[in-house]
Amino acid sequence: MTTEPTPRAATAPDDRPVPTPEDLLEPLALVVRGHHDDLTAVAARHGLSTSQARALIALNEPMPMSALAAHLVCDASNATGLVGRMETRGLVRRTPAPGDRRSKVASRTPEGTELAHTIRAEMRAVHAALEALTAEERTALLPLLNKLGQQLYA
């Protein structure tokens, strides 16, 4: 009678088990939730929804409305409403797209740029968590996060 060998978990060079994708999902979800909660609280202090804050931060360069909608993972009418509410507050402006006057490009006003920087600076929970990492850990983490993002949205 032949018995099948019991499969062994893969191990890293230092003999620790290599985490499976499932092992990584919960800690990753916790980080994402922390970022979302932090952004939501800071946005509310400035009278913005989380989606408006995300849009304001994303507009570090002028962006076609369709690209902003894709970035926010929403439909064009939702992005138009978000931008319209921020435009009313003087945070964003819409201008005709070069070469296609039917399309619009959204960009931040100076007030919008200042608020976007303020929101980022006030996201203390995220900053504190990242500052707790060593320089080497942050240096190692950045390319891994970029690779994950590229895999998800390539």
Positions of the model-derived regions?
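Charged, amphipathic alpha-helical coiled-coil/dimerization segments
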Residues: G84-N146
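Short, locally clustered residues in the helix-turn-helix/winged-helix DNA-binding domain
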Residues: V32, I57-E61, N146
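N-terminal helix-turn-helix DNA-binding core of bacterial DNA-binding proteins
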Residues: D37-N78
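N-terminal leader segment of winged-helix/HTH proteins
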Residues: M1-H46, P110, A132, K147
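DNA-binding alpha-helical recognition surfaces that contact promoter or target DNA
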Residues: I57, G81, P143
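Generic C-terminal helix-cap and adjacent flexible tail
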Residues: Q150-A154
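Pre-recognition alpha-helix immediately N-terminal to the DNA-recognition helix
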Residues: P27, G34, D38, R54-I57, ...
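Basic amphipathic alpha-helical segments that dock to polyanions
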Residues: L56, L68, V83-R89
